[in-house]
UniProtKB/Swiss-Prot annotation:
Enzyme class: transferase
Binding site for Mg(2+) 1: S93, E227
UniProt keyword list: Amino-acid biosynthesis, Aromatic amino acid biosynthesis, Glycosyltransferase, Magnesium, Metal-binding, Transferase, Tryptophan biosynthesis
Assigned protein family: Belongs to the anthranilate phosphoribosyltransferase family.
Cofactor: Mg(2+)
Catalysed reaction, written as an equation: N-(5-phospho-beta-D-ribosyl)anthranilate + diphosphate = 5-phospho-alpha-D-ribose 1-diphosphate + anthranilate
Gene for this chain: trpD
Organism of derivation: Ruegeria sp. (strain TM1040) (Silicibacter sp.)
Pfam families in UniProt: Glycos_trans_3N, Glycos_transf_3
Subunit organization: Homodimer.
Annotated signal sequence range: none
Official protein name in the record: Anthranilate phosphoribosyltransferase
Binding-site residues, 5-phospho-alpha-D-ribose 1-diphosphate: 81, 84-85, 89, 91-94, 109-117, 121
Length: 340
């Protein structure tokens, strides 16, 4: 039992914790000092009252401090979603990561098993021949040689094991449902991050600012997806290099792309998703391709290599049609397979 945590649970139910108080509380969780009852008490107190930016930042900072880190270039970025949107779409952020890497931007992607898709990023990558359960040394080799890596959350955040049984028993969303995108082990400074709720995009942008990010787009689709949607409008909270956070909308037409019905981007089994993924990277036209082009355009804008979404979509299409994006998949599969 953690004596330090006990009074903080009571405080958390009544008021927002300060950054220091929240760091003390989450250190107790991640150090394995808290009992399951204390963990559950803290998580539910925060959820019931509603977490604050300081509490998000504190939890993420403690997780980052305890993670198995990865060395990455200064211009590397992450492309990730919270998951948990329940929409079962194709693996859009995963495909986007390879397209962006094919366009020359280093991508250090943080991910896990399926949450919102019928198969998550790790599931689709496994079907594509990529070994995901590899450690930091292999990840760094992949990033250095292929320009992209996939960091499996359990391989980099062992401290989370202390909390997993309690999370599973609670069976409801907690602060941990948004911590993945906030705790990239490569400490990237640029992010395209999807959220399962529009209400999260502003506080998540403010949290990333506190944690030292330079440029980030936090996005949510009007169809409920945790990415820029090809089915209509998306909402964005954008952190710019001057530290300002602005909120705006993105429409597919801004990238020169048509809208598609939601049914056209619904995924299936890991094998089905991997087949769609490969067809996309081989240049097959589809709603899936357009969804990936839209998100890739945004990522390239966040990376600072294009000035408009239309230019970004054109650059992304070139990455696909030249075979560069598929080449990145092949390279990562080779590097991770040689290491396993």
């Amino acid at each position: 039992m953690s004596d330090a945590l006990k009074p903080l649970i009571g405080l958390a139910a009544d008021r927002a914790l300060t950054r220091t108080e929240a760091e003390t509380a989450f250190a107790a969780l991640f150090n394995g000092e808290a009992t399951p009852s204390q963990m559950g008490g803290l998580l539910m107190a925060l959820r019931t009252r509603g977490e604050t930016v300081d509490e998000y930042a504190a939890a993420a900072a403690v997780m980052r401090a305890k993670c198995n880190k990865v060395s990455a270039p200064a211009d590397a970025m992450d492309i990730v979603g919270t998951g948990g949107d329940g929409k079962g779409t194709l693996n859009i952020s995963t495909a986007t990561a390879f397209v962006v890497a094919g366009a020359g931007v280093p991508v250090a992607k943080h991910g896990n098993r399926n949450l919102s898709s019928k198969s998550g990023a790790a599931d689709a990558l496994t079907e594509m021949g990529i070994q995901v359960m590899v450690g930091p040394k292999v990840v760094e080799k992949s990033l250095k040689e292929a320009g992209i890596c996939f960091m499996m959350a359990p391989m980099h955040h062992p401290a989370i094991a202390h909390v997993m049984p309690t999370r599973q028993e609670l069976g409801t969303r907690t602060i941990f449902n948004i911590l993945g995108p906030l705790t990239n082990p490569a400490d990237v400074k640029r992010q395209l991050t999807g959220a399962f709720s529009r209400d999260l995009i502003r506080p998540m942008a403010e949290t990333l600012k506190q944690l030292g990010s330079e440029v980030a787009w936090l996005v949510h689709g009007s169809d409920g997806t945790d990415e820029l949607t090809i089915t209509g409008v998306s909402w964005v909270a954008g952190l710019s290099e001057d530290g300002n956070i602005s909120e705006f909308e993105v429409h597919p037409e801004e990238a020169g792309l048509p809208e598609h019905p939601f049914e056209a981007i619904v995924g299936g089994t890991p094998a089905e998703n991997a087949a769609a993924f490969r067809a996309l990277l081989e240049g097959t036209p589809s709603a899936y391709r357009d969804a990936v082009l839209l998100n890739s355009a945004a990522a390239l804008k966040v990376a600072g290599v294009v000035s408009s979404l239309k230019e970004g979509a054109e650059r992304a299409a070139e990455s696909i049609d030249s075979g560069a994006a598929l080449g990145k998949v092949t390279a990562v599969a080779r590097i991770t397979s040689e290491a396993s």
